[in-house]
């Protein structure tokens, strides 16, 4: 690597070098209709985005990634007649997938654990408590998946979930041009957002249904069941997700099969599920019919981690650690911290206390994470 007097540029060149090494050996995951999509990227050494890119082959995509070694790489949720046209109106919009973005730092479980940092190379940045926050975000992704499948009727094979490479998850429903939802504008997509968030849902709708006990002639409450429609069915499916995480098989059986047993434990799970009835998603991402989204298996330049596909069941045990970095096999890297962190933080499973001027040698994934965040540079 060439040495530069500018530590920031030298750091970015180093990150670009590592990124190129990754793209030389790896392949990103593209949708089958990628030739109808617009692509965009930002390099490690530039501030502006290179947009209006289109490709006719996967090899052309690979060549560009090796050449540019981009910090960020995106493709459009929309399909176009002319995706490479510079003018958006000239592209000829055809349709768009449904896209959802879940950010851990927007969730109530995470709000009290965010560490804000000023004075970094990239400006203000922040760190989250990874285990707590990402577990909460993973649960929201599972709840969203269940809504899409069991309430909105989308085929499981069309739904993809990815770790964003930073602090959340992307959920995409891949659609064809002829699908009504694919042609839907922002207004219809906003209605879907409101439905997912359970906006306007009356509290009484969540109350237990009752049945008349013939022998005693009095109503008894019926536990929520995953086969039910509407809000009660959603509550039951959330209970199932929570119980599966905890290994509470009796609770899973109670909401999956016909049951009139309303145990105290089930009531506790139901109380938790009611609080999760609305999924906190980024509305702007979902209503935008021309959204740029990160390409699976590309590098997220905010952290140096991969945009990693995960299955809905893998979310139960999802953790952010060094295995999510494409640089796990690189040798340790010495960095110089350029701004102090006000408290210790956990980065990829490593608990760190960093002060300005510190020069630790760290595992490559952790060092890259800190340099990408702008709180450290490559040491001389």
UniProtKB/Swiss-Prot annotation:
InterPro entries: DNA_primase_S, DNA_primase_ssu_euk/arc, DNA_primase_ssu_PriS. Heterodimer of a small subunit (PriS) and a large subunit (PriL). Belongs to the eukaryotic-type primase small subunit family. The active site is at residues 101, 103, 282. Pfam families: DNA_primase_S. Its EC number is 2.7.7.-. Catalytic subunit of DNA primase, an RNA polymerase that catalyzes the synthesis of short RNA molecules used as primers for DNA polymerase during DNA replication. The small subunit contains the primase catalytic core and has DNA synthesis activity on its own. Binding to the large subunit stabilizes and modulates the activity, increasing the rate of DNA synthesis while decreasing the length of the DNA fragments, and conferring RNA synthesis capability. The DNA polymerase activity may enable DNA primase to also catalyze primer extension after primer synthesis. May also play a role in DNA repair. This is DNA primase small subunit PriS. It comes from Hyperthermus butylicus (strain DSM 5456 / JCM 9403 / PLM1-5). One of its GO terms (biological process) is DNA replication, synthesis of primer. Its cofactor is Mg(2+); Mn(2+). Keywords: DNA replication, DNA-directed RNA polymerase, Magnesium, Manganese, Metal-binding, Nucleotidyltransferase, Primosome, Transcription, Transferase. GO terms for molecular function: DNA-directed RNA polymerase activity; metal ion binding. It is an enzyme of class 2 (transferase). GO terms for cellular component: DNA-directed RNA polymerase complex; primosome complex.
């Amino acid at each position: 690597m060439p040495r530069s007097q500018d530590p920031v540029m030298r750091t970015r060149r180093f990150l670009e070098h590592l990124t190129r090494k990754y793209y030389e050996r790896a392949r990103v995951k593209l949708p089958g209709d990628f030739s109808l999509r617009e692509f965009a990227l930002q390099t490690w050494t530039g501030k502006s985005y290179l947009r209006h890119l289109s490709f006719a082959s996967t090899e052309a995509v690979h060549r560009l990634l090796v050449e540019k070694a981009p910090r960020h790489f995106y493709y459009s949720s929309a399909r176009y007649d002319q995706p490479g046209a510079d003018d958006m109106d000239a592209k000829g919009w055809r349709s768009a997938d449904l896209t959802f973005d879940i950010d851990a730092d927007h969730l109530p479980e995470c709000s009290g654990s965010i560490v804000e940092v000023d004075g970094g190379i990239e400006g203000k940045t922040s760190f989250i408590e990874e285990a707590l926050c990402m577990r909460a975000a993973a649960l929201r992704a599972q709840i969203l998946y269940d809504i899409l499948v069991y309430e909105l009727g989308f085929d499981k094979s069309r739904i993809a979930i990815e770790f964003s490479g930073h602090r959340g998850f992307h959920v995409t429903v891949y659609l064809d041009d002829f699908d009504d939802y694919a042609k839907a504008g922002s207004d219809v997509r906003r209605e879907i957002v409101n439905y997912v968030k359970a906006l306007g849902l009356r509290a009484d709708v969540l109350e237990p249904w009752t049945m008349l006990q013939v022998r005693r002639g009095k109503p008894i409450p019926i536990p929520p069941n995953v086969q039910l429609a509407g809000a009660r069915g959603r509550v039951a499916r959330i209970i199932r997700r929570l119980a599966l995480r905890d290994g509470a098989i009796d609770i899973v059986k109670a909401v999956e099969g016909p049951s009139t047993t309303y145990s105290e434990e089930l009531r506790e799970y139901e109380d938790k599920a009611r609080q999760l009835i609305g999924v906190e998603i980024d509305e702007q991402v979902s209503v935008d019919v021309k959204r740029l989204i990160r390409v699976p298996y590309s590098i997220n330049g905010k952290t140096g981690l991969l945009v990693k596909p995960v299955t809905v069941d893998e979310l139960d045990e999802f953790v952010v650690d060094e295995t999510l970095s494409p640089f796990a096999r690189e040798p340790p890297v010495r960095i110089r911290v350029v701004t102090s962190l006000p408290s210790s933080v956990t980065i990829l499973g490593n608990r760190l206390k960093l002060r300005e001027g510190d020069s630790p040698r760290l595992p490559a994934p952790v060092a890259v994470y800190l340099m990408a965040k702008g709180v450290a540079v490559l040491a001389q």
